[in-house]
Amino acid sequence: MSISKYSIRFLSDKATRFVPKSGVYPKGYAVGGIHCGVKKDGKSLDLAILQNTFNKEASTAGVFTQNKFKAAPVQVSMRILKQKSGSGINSFVINSGNANAVTGSKGMKDAEEMVTVTDSVLENPKDSTLVMSTGVIGNNLPIDNILTGIPKLSLNHLGNTHQHWIDCATAICTTDTFPKLVTKQFNLGNDTYTLAGLCKGAGMICPNMATLLGFFVTDAPVSPNALQQILRYAVDRSFNSITVDGDMSTNDTIVAMANGAAGGELIDNTSSSAERFSALQTEIVDFAQQLAQLVVRDGEGATKFITLKVNDALSYKDAKSIASSIANSSLFKTAMYGKDANWGRILCAIGYADVSTDQSVIPNKTSVKFVPVDGSEPIKIIWLMVNSKKLTKIELQKYYKMKIW
């Protein structure tokens, strides 16, 4: 990672481990980030733009917060995405340091202005930009700084190099200790495609997404309906399956864009495209999980990274409910913080999980297993019924010994 005046604060152990030093990025995109004056330190990047440069017909999908106090940029982006039916959105504009949430009509006007100015500078048709904000709730944006910064960023600081992507990922950060950026290439038949993703998190992380912004872009050709279906499926199995502090924010937004710049046959959610659709969905789920794990690793005050695996549940919904019940248990969290393999607290959380039927959790057919990440034998196994033919197994995979970051 190159060092600059705005990335110096990311020189931490986690930044060294998790920030990529290089990457291969999808074709047909220009990204970047600058300091425009939202953050008050005078140097931290706080304005980012991601632009599709390949054509004006990119497919876009989005998943947004379930909080009833949706921030102004969330409301504006939801309106535009619905109005466009996921087609013809060509850019994202994001500010950090101010959430533009609970800001009334002034906040709505500011969000709309960010869209209008970005569209004008990038020569987009009207309402071709989604807008996102993250930061402090309840304060009006320094909108003049942002509207001045958008042309400066658009005309002078966009590109597709690794540093441009690092700048973009850095500019959306708030309390994060490192920028979160992942890239991968994959093959669908004879076609090679690239995915790039960036996100921010740190505090208020809980299903269904919180203080979370995330962006997936690819050069694969994907229809809007297929992209929306894949994104929702992937988010449910990644960003909606993590928790740090159990709070849900007002600004959560995960968006995806596919511009088709790498060519190939259109991927749709029809029977004729079923194989390619399934393969792409698998790639994006894996990709989303990588990004979501970075959010957990950077959770405010987090000292552990734990994966919960529920096996042999009656349904995916039940498995997720059981895992969420354990993960959000304060008693379980304190036990893990204290390095105490207190399996009783785990069973307690399983017992009050919101499952579908009385048969979803059968006490005398339930086991708990603690699994070291190095693949060695479980450090403790609790069998409540050793001779049962089929057990519901709860596995906890601990990735790091206790470490204060």
Swiss-Prot record:
Q: What is its main location?
A: mitochondrion
- Entries under InterPro entries matching the protein: Arg_biosynth_ArgJ (IPR002813), ArgJ-like_dom_sf (IPR016117), ArgJ_beta_C (IPR042195)
Q: What is its EC number?
A: 2.3.1.35, 2.3.1.1
Post-translation changes: The alpha and beta chains are autoproteolytically processed from a single precursor protein within the mitochondrion.
Compartments in which it is found: Mitochondrion matrix
Q: Which residues bind substrate?
A: 174, 200, 211, 300
Annotated site (Involved in the stabilization of negative charge on the oxyanion by the formation of the oxyanion hole), which positions?
134-135
Q: What positions are marked as the site Cleavage?
A: 210-211
The reaction(s) catalysed by this protein are: N(2)-acetyl-L-ornithine + L-glutamate = N-acetyl-L-glutamate + L-ornithine; L-glutamate + acetyl-CoA = N-acetyl-L-glutamate + CoA + H(+)
What enzyme category does the UniProt record give?
transferase
A GO molecular function term, named singly, is: glutamate N-acetyltransferase activity
One Pfam family of this chain = ArgJ
One of the record's GO cellular component terms:
mitochondrial matrix
Instruction: Name the pathway it acts in.
Output: Amino-acid biosynthesis; L-arginine biosynthesis; L-ornithine and N-acetyl-L-glutamate from L-glutamate and N(2)-acetyl-L-ornithine (cyclic): step 1/1; Amino-acid biosynthesis; L-arginine biosynthesis; N(2)-acetyl-L-ornithine from L-glutamate: step 1/4
Q: What does this protein do?
A: Catalyzes two activities which are involved in the cyclic version of arginine biosynthesis: the synthesis of acetylglutamate from glutamate and acetyl-CoA, and of ornithine by transacetylation between acetylornithine and glutamate.
**Family to which this protein belongs:** Belongs to the ArgJ family.
Oligomeric form and interacting partners: Heterodimer of an alpha and a beta chain.
Question: What's the name of the protein?
Answer: Arginine biosynthesis bifunctional protein ArgJ, mitochondrial
Q: Which organism is it from?
A: Candida tropicalis (strain ATCC MYA-3404 / T1)
At the highest ranks, the source species' classification is: Eukaryota, Fungi, Dikarya, Ascomycota, Saccharomycotina
